[in-house]
């Protein structure tokens, strides 16, 4: 230990980080339960979402960057989903080896089905929370994510 103490902001941020770590684990477990009947996991669902919301097919490295994950982990999931017929790889005119990842019809259907399950789940989970507080929490987490992205 250095003997240095957190500022009040540093202490609050550390508490937030710990809460986010706990939430992340619980969110992944809940997501796994929610989409398991679709043959998905939270990890696959997350990658499907990144592909679905991208403006056009993207290389794995770009998808990983947009999710704050490492390329190797996303590549493994993309490979599995390709074997299962959820995604296809297309030639990239800008890079011979970095193929573009796109959803297949089956992948689009799986993501749509997961989204249909997520809507009532999220609505139920949001009950009792103030909309403005949730929006403020979302803004804060996005701002922290942006700062961390710039610092690496």
List the model feature ranges, each with a label.
Residues 1-38, 132:
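N-terminal leader segment of winged-helix/HTH proteins
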Residues 2-4, 28, 79-139:
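Charged, amphipathic alpha-helical coiled-coil/dimerization segments
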Residues 17, 21, 25, 68, ...:
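Short amphipathic alpha-helical segments with heptad-repeat character
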Residues 20, 48-51, 141:
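Hydrophobic structural patches
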Residues 135-152:
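Exposed, interaction-prone assembly regions rather than primary DNA-binding/catalytic cores
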């Amino acid at each position: 230990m250095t003997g240095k103490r957190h500022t009040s902001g540093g202490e609050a941020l550390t508490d937030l980080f710990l809460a986010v770590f706990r939430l992340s684990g619980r969110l992944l477990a809940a997501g796994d339960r929610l989409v398991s009947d679709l043959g998905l996991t939270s990890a696959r669902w997350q990658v499907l979402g990144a592909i679905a919301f991208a403006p056009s097919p993207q290389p794995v490295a770009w998808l990983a960057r947009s999710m704050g994950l490492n390329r190797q982990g996303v590549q493994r999931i993309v490979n599995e989903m390709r074997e299962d017929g959820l995604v296809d790889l297309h030639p990239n005119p800008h890079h011979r080896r970095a193929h573009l990842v796109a959803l297949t019809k089956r992948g689009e259907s799986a993501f749509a089905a997961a989204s249909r399950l997520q809507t009532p789940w999220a609505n139920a989970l949001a009950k009792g929370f103030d909309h403005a507080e949730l929006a403020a929490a979302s803004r804060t987490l996005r701002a922290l994510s942006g700062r961390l992205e710039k610092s690496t």
